[in-house]
């Protein structure tokens, strides 16, 4: 099937990132990166972009996170120790996309756990995350808890568990990452 990348700034069928020296100030994604124009690329207002998201027309979104709970709660808009945050479009994506995948490092830069039993950071979306992909593991949050699906080469279940703030359910068909 065909994948069309959507930018909440008002682009559908986003092209690849522009090469240095080829930047066009009119082709910028929601992250502020310059894009290359591609055939079929379309432009619209951010209002229409958010209508697509809120209307359930986005199949999959990939978001970063500060914390994810074992039940799939997402916290990605504010770090309480900073006292400020900006929720941006993540709340709309968490609520409007059919599937939410979180891609993040397994721990923060201070080695604090980011996958927790219950989020203690402000919640962006409740029970919205369907898959967590980190540098150490792939996990699936469920109402019964966190299922460990894949583990990074060279890491044991015990080692990954020691840097995770929620207990795993370990299925009999646990796989190693294929890099």
What are these regions (language model features)?
Residues 1-16:
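N-terminal low-complexity or amphipathic/hydrophobic leaders
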Residues 13-179:
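Conserved phosphate- and dinucleotide-binding cores of soluble alpha/beta proteins
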